[in-house]
């Protein structure tokens, strides 16, 4: 049998086993072996329902702690709150450097008044370096996003007020029912309010991590300079391995090749920490 960890509270592992919620405990020796478990870890069970093995992870995110992700969805509004490209860039760097794949980028509140030409340039710049961009005011984009997330494990990230909750309910209107069922099962005290949990979502799973914030990232200049997949492929062609790709960086290959708008966003981010 296989168990999927939905949430962890101290030594209690709340898992889904054969479509039922079960409370399991890791073998005592795992603590001494420093085997640290995370939500969405898959566990092999014996016939008695005891944990015997942690199935190898395909990826792992350190903050919030979660394993085996298929998609990261970054939700940013065009206004209210105003689109912050520096924060978007930081999210992109963080998730790509940790997981090795590009997040999906969703823009909301496009019905509000905004500079359409400027927004078009942003979308084109992101698509030029192979990001999938979704505009929630376009039905085809919404359907394309929904199809991509079907039967997958997904985490959504975005600041308060960008419309993330509305989007989730629009994607899967049964989410509230499952959320209430799991929350009742996992009710174990005040610490669970910020604990990472998994909920059924589009025949897959939604990772809910209410305690996670962009302000927790503390990215270094080295992470920023090569964290994006697109940046990493150019980093090796720069004259210096530790090139920061600044305007005065000698023989920097990246600044010759990368989209100019993306490069300007990068400069504004890295200059804020050096």
UniProtKB/Swiss-Prot annotation:
Its EC number is 3.6.1.-. It is found in: Cytoplasm. It is an enzyme of class 3 (hydrolase). Residues 58-215 form the CP-type G domain. Keywords: Cytoplasm, GTP-binding, Hydrolase, Metal-binding, Nucleotide-binding, Ribosome biogenesis, RNA-binding, rRNA-binding, Zinc. The keyword GTP-binding applies. Its cofactor is Zn(2+). It comes from the Bacteria. Belongs to the TRAFAC class YlqF/YawG GTPase family. RsgA subfamily. One of several proteins that assist in the late maturation steps of the functional core of the 30S ribosomal subunit. Helps release RbfA from mature subunits. May play a role in the assembly of ribosomal proteins into the subunit. Circularly permuted GTPase that catalyzes slow GTP hydrolysis, GTPase activity is stimulated by the 30S ribosomal subunit. Monomer. Associates with 30S ribosomal subunit, binds 16S rRNA. This is Small ribosomal subunit biogenesis GTPase RsgA. It comes from Mycoplasmoides gallisepticum (strain R(low / passage 15 / clone 2)) (Mycoplasma gallisepticum).
